[in-house]
Amino acid sequence: MAANVQTSSLLFLVFLLLQNFYSANSQSFLGVNYGQLSDNLPSLQATVNLLKSTTIQKVRLFGAEPAVIKAFANTGVEIVIGFDNGDIPTLASNPNVASQFVKSNVMSFYPASNIIAITVGNEVLTSGDQKLISQLLPAMQNVQNALNAASLGGKVKVSTVHAMAVLSQSYPPSSGVFNPGLGDTMKALLQFQSANDAPFMISPYPYFAYKNQPTPDTLAFCLFQPNAGQVDSGNGHKYTNMFDAQVDAVHSALNAMGFKDIEIVVAETGWPHGGDSNEVGPSLDNAKAYVGNLINHLKSKVGTPLMPGKSIDTYLFSLYDEDKKTGASSEKYFGLFKPDGSTTYDVGLLKNTQNPTTPATPTPTPKAAGSWCVPKPGVSDDQLTGNINYACGQGIDCGPIQPGGACFEPNTVKAHAAYVMNLYYQSAGRNSWNCDFSQTATLTNTNPSYGACNFPSGSN
């Protein structure tokens, strides 16, 4: 176990170092859903200009309108286009429909419009429509064949988007399995996707998990806020947020069927900033916390316990509010931006602006009296590694503990954890609960700074 902990910590630090080579003005893992069920949307050109002003690098469309695809030409934005569920029967029965679609909606614009994937349907396998379910794979195969005929088979991927309900079990994450009722259908679908190197697209929404269990602990777990965490009884991994738990449950389900190497893409996730007064969870503060902390978590490249050291491609839901959506009122209020291009809440998506939830690097100052957050004696390296991953995943500047940084030496898990745990405590508000870390931390009045390594405090 000790060797695994040291390896895990080292891998984390290596990936943390590598992330500095990526441009601060782009986040290649981050996309957004561009829904258009609204009567108050800005013009298409205004939307393109808005996205170009952000760090968002991908956009998912729910259709394939030629004007929209063309508008994103030469922008560098990667595009996912899609078929509605209602298109599936015709696609499945008539290969010519797929061929014509590829000719008119892909070849006419590619590569100037950087189309990277085509989604065939949304949440089909959990629709309950057995006929539609049986037609899904033939429809996808016809689209794939049309792309192959156009020499685009290896460049434009074919997938379909699933709800978390495709899993019959998701907790603990290591026990994740697909609904056995999907049986051969899911296996055939995964064989197709594996053969074509296509991603498995899923829509995890921690918001709905909180809605089903609205407790303060669940909210903190869903919003990436400090919490006691949950230990997976199957493998001992500790989870500090619901997003990682849901994604790893999908990974476990894929692994259980022999397809652990299929890439997982989060097709949509978000949190409503408004809703009816009787709805639990929607609020501006909760939406900002979830989306902002999710972005910081992805940016950190910590990954998940089962897929460490990488950022999963994630499409936020959604670009704008959609007042024509049906269902609960909250369904209308997932928008990141307002029609005038201003932010609904600021999570640092605009280029050349700092994420407001990401503290700046503290300026070293002379040591002074104050309070500092440090590990308790006797805490294991395993627990401290989890604290490092959590704190750095919240967006604090962990550069000083990277090789060459002022706090890299001594190169021990305990020393690195002490620095980042304190920095998180100071940045998060200096409340006692900001120095809890599942009861592995304590406050001290003794300044732990040493040499050039400065531990900031409230009085610094």
From Swiss-Prot:
Name the chemical reaction catalysed here.
Hydrolysis of (1->3)-beta-D-glucosidic linkages in (1->3)-beta-D-glucans
Query: Could you tell me which Gene3D superfamilies the record lists for this protein?
Result: 1.20.58.1040, Glycosidases
Q: Which Pfam families match?
A: Glyco_hydro_17, X8
| Database matches in InterPro entries | Glyco_hydro_17 (IPR000490), Glyco_hydro_17_plant (IPR044965), Glycoside_hydrolase_SF (IPR017853), X8 (IPR012946)
Q: Which tissues show it?
A: Expressed only in pollen.
Any one GO biological process: (1->3)-beta-D-glucan catabolic process
The positions flagged as glycosylation sites are: N355, N447
Q: What is its EC number?
A: 3.2.1.39
What is the residue range of the signal peptide feature?
A: 1-26
What ranges does the record give for the region Disordered, renumbered to this chain? Answer: 352-371
Task: Tell me the domain of life.
Answer: Eukaryota
Catalytic residues per the record? E123 (proton donor), E268 (nucleophile)
The cellular component terms of Gene Ontology attached to this UniProt record, alphabetical and capped at eight, are: extracellular region
Q: Where is this protein localized, as stated in its record?
A: Secreted
Q: Which GO terms describe its molecular function?
A: glucan endo-1,3-beta-D-glucosidase activity; protein homodimerization activity
Keyword set, alphabetical order:
Allergen, Disulfide bond, Glycoprotein, Glycosidase, Hydrolase, Secreted, Signal
Bridged cysteine pairs (disulfide):
C373-C435
pH dependence statement: Optimum pH is 4.5-6.0.
- Please outline how this chain is modified post-translation: Glycosylated. Contains two additional disulfide bonds, but it is unclear if they are between the pairs Cys-392-Cys-398 and Cys-407-Cys-453 (PudMed:18096638) or between the pairs Cys-392-Cys-453 and Cys-398-Cys-407 (PudMed:12392450).
Mind telling me which PANTHER family this protein's record contains?
GLUCAN ENDO-1,3-BETA-GLUCOSIDASE BG1-RELATED-RELATED
- Family per record: Belongs to the glycosyl hydrolase 17 family.
Subunit description? Homodimer.
Q: What is known of its domains?
A: The N-terminal region (1-350) contains the enzymatic activity while the C-terminal region (360-460) can bind laminarin. Both regions are allergenic by themselves.
Q: What is this protein called?
A: Glucan endo-1,3-beta-D-glucosidase
The source organism is Olea europaea (Common olive)
Encoding gene, per UniProt annotation = OLE9
